[in-house]
């Protein structure tokens, strides 16, 4: 029973279709009226559009992972025009997903592109029919990811050009390049933006050779995963540029030229309207500019690596030429099946001492969550997941600039995996965690059987000199238990 439950939870995402493996089913919340974070599987590529043509914006989200590949439709129930945060219906799979799917809105119609192709009549064809846009779709040689293509009338001449953001990985060289002080010795990620100018028309397009776009006299280069969005963010009538990145932030390039002759100023890392850095909770972010709330300015609908999607609302204000956005707020859906970010690592235990088995789980973001079993026997009713705290703070382990062997580009991942045991033999459940760092940590339960409370982490030490992987740049001491 416990083994099957683990498999089902790891597989769970927020849609109610059975797993295509004999005997396995996703765990349902069995909790009508419960709202949870809207989400798909690993990697969310939001395609906001009026999917069902009922006059409001729905969320269509592409999820290119396995085993839950698909494009999922989250219906906006239409409970009030201008409602920024409707509780979406549970997802319906409406087609197959590929990587790099991006939406463009042309003359009021949603058009979906992936690198080099347009997906034709996608409502009818389940995103399965494509049209090649140019003979050579490979705009940059070498190690590339995040080849993000969109339509935009770049130069205001009335036809749709193509812009493409491309992430380049050739300088990063991926792994094991820290010096003894934990400083990365290889290069960074790059995120470039290219233009394919349409010298024809929309009915008979003819795309010119690629142009690499510049800002402030230098090539536009963000930290990978550029997701370029051209829109009038500052309300002056021309198209500015806003990019995402492989980490969690945004870069803004003001158009200091004109609508027909764009020229971009130096990129500025964005802050929110409160003066703090404008960042998502996780990374590998995929922003799409759209007037989500119908107030006349361009908001951002942004996907995270763990399948969640957030709204970053434009306040309508511009400060020093930079649009002012509110911090992200994550959308919610009607609860369907249990999900905890991506790559969930569930452990079944009676955490709250009430006689039934709950679920404690880690995930890619480095959190540890508690799903409380509210009863129901063989078909339990589950509460919304709660992130655990330790030492009075939300328990979250992240790599930071040097905790992942695979480079600083994994700074916001934690990959928490765990067990629950009475480590100190005091009759209470403690938490034992491994993570992206490879150090085994003990979180002592200093609460009670019915109300667990975790102390701050302590390293686990064993007698004798412990072996340490040769590729570690850091040293936690001779006795500290480390892995990997």
Stretches found by the model and what they are:
Residues 17-484:
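Beta-propeller-forming repeat regions
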Residues 4-14:
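Bacterial N-terminal signal peptides
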């Amino acid at each position: 029973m416990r083994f099957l439950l683990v498999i089902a939870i790891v597989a769970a995402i927020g849609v109610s279709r059975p797993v295509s493996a004999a005997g396995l089913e996703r765990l349902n919340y069995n909790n009508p009226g419960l709202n949870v974070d809207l989400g798909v599987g690993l990697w969310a590529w939001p395609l906001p559009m009026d999917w069902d043509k009922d006059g409001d914006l729905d969320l269509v989200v592409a999820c290119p992972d396995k085993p839950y590949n698909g494009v999922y439709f989250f219906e906006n129930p239409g409970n009030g025009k201008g409602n920024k945060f409707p509780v979406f219906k549970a997802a319906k799979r409406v087609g197959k997903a590929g990587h790099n799917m991006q939406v463009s809105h042309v003359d009021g119609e949603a058009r979906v592109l992936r690198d080099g192709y347009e997906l034709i009549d996608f409502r009818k064809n389940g995103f399965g029919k494509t049209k090649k846009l140019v003979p050579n779709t490979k705009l940059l040689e070498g190690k590339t990811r995040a080849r993000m293509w969109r339509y935009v009338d770049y130069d205001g001449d009335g036809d749709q050009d193509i812009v493409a953001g491309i992430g380049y990985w050739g300088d990063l060289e991926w792994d094991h390049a820290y010096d003894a002080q934990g400083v990365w010795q290889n290069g960074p990620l790059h995120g470039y933006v290219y233009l394919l100018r349409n010298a024809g028309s929309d009915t008979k397009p003819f795309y010119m050779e690629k142009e690499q776009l510049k800002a402030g006299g230098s090539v536009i280069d963000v930290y990978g995963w550029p997701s370029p969005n051209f829109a009038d963010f500052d309300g002056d009538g021309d198209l500015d540029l806003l990019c995402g990145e492989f980490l969690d932030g945004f870069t803004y390039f003001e158009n200091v030229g004109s609508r027909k002759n764009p020229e971009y100023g130096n990129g500025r890392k964005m802050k929110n309207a409160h003066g703090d850095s404008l960042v998502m909770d996780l990374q590998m972010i995929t922003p799409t500019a759209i007037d989500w709330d119908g107030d006349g300015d361009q908001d951002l609908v942004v996907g995270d690596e763990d399948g969640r999607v957030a709204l970053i609302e434009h306040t309508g204000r511009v400060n020093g030429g930079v649009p002012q956005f509110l911090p992200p707020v994550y959308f919610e859906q009607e609860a369907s099946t249990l999900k905890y970010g991506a790559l969930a690592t569930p452990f079944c235990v009676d955490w709250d001492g009430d006689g039934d088995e709950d679920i404690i789980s880690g995930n890619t973001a480095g959190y540890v969550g508690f799903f409380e079993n509210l009863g129901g026997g063989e078909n339990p009713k589950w509460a919304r997941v709660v992130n655990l705290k330790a030492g009075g703070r939300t328990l979250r382990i992240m790599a930071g600039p040097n905790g992942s062997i695979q480079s600083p580009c994994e700074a916001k991942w934690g990959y928490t995996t765990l067990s629950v045991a009475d480590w100190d033999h005091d009759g209470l459940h403690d938490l034992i965690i491994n993570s992206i760092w490879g150090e085994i940590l003990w979180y002592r339960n200093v609460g009670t059987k019915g109300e667990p409370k975790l102390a701050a982490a302590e390293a686990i030490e064993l007698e004798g000199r412990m072996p340490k992987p040769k590729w570690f740049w850091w040293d936690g001491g001779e006795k500290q238990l480390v892995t990997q």
